[in-house]
């Protein structure tokens, strides 16, 4: 970071530290340690909010200060150039945004999950509860927030098939709920890529199933994925 950029970041850094713990604000962050490709340059600043209030206040601050920022999940499917990122990276960490709420009906199951939960973690929890309909996503890398952002899918299923609504932070830093019909889902795309709204939680409708059948289907899909993809090497995820 140049001296000018250091000076430019000093005041926002102090304000960020007033919102989150000081140890959760890192200057000159090596982003190769945060992305699945394991390459890339430095970010001017890296901040990790621990709750929704902190996240909203961070976004409001960055917009008020007209500071470039990027919100990431677990670091899959994107990369920072070797020249670095001249702005603030905000990480929605699985550690702080990974809660699952589940309501079971006779044949269906409505779940609401926070954006930071890993797809693999959610898949395991749903298997434990004998909830079906998420098998296609069991091997998709990253977080549920990222999956909704890009309408992730595999083996005939997509996020748009199960999403009911999405809670986001809008351009003003306020929260609102977007219905599935308003999400403008298409192949590997959603309105979020245009609006820059930030996913904070997702409500999905799944169904009850047989645990052993669910596990068997996931095992079959995992085998296919391992046969076709370089799972032991750094990649998009």
Task: For every predicted segment, state its role.
Residues 1-7:
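N-terminal amphipathic/basic-hydrophobic helices that include classical n-h-c signal peptides
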Residues 8-144:
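Anion-binding (especially nucleotide phosphate/pyrophosphate-binding) glycine-rich loop
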Residues 13, 55-59, 123, 163, ...:
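A generic alpha-helix structural signal
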Residues 21, 33, 43, 74, ...:
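A generic structural signal for well-ordered coil/turn residues at beta-strand boundaries
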Residues 26-27, 36, 78, 169-171, ...:
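Phosphate/pyrophosphate- and phosphate-bearing ligand-binding catalytic cores of soluble enzymes
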Residues 41, 47-52, 79-98, 149-179, ...:
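Structural signature of FAD isoalloxazine-binding scaffolds in flavoprotein oxidoreductases
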Residues 77-78, 123-126, 134-138, 151-158, ...:
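A generic local secondary-structure boundary/capping motif
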Residues 119, 123, 137, 141, ...:
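Hydrophobic, well-ordered secondary-structure segments
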């Amino acid at each position: 970071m140049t001296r000018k950029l250091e000076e430019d970041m000093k005041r926002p850094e102090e304000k960020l530290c007033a919102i989150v713990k000081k140890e959760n604000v890192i200057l000159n962050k090596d982003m190769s340690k945060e992305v699945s490709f394991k390459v890339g340059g430095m970010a001017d600043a890296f901040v990790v909010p621990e709750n929704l209030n902190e996240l909203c206040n961070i976004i409001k601050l960055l917009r008020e200060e007209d500071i470039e920022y990027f919100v990431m999940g677990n670091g899959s499917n994107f990369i920072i150039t070797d020249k670095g990122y001249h702005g603030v990276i905000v990480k929605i960490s699985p550690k702080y945004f990974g809660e699952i709420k589940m309501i079971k009906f006779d044949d269906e199951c409505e779940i609401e999950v926070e954006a930071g939960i890993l797809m693999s973690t959610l898949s395991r929890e749903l298997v434990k509860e004998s909830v079906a309909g998420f098998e296609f996503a069991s091997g998709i890398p990253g977080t549920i927030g990222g999956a909704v952002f890009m309408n992730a899918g595999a083996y005939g299923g997509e996020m748009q098939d199960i999403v009911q609504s999405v809670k986001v932070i809008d351009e003003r830093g306020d929260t609102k709920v977007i219905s599935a019909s308003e999400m403008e889902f298409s192949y590997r795309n959603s309105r979020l890529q245009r609006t820059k709204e930030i996913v904070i939680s997702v409500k999905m409708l799944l169904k009850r199933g047989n645990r052993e059948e669910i596990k068997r289907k996931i095992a079959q899909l995992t085998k296919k994925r391992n046969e076709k993809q370089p799972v032991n090497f750094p990649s998009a995820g």
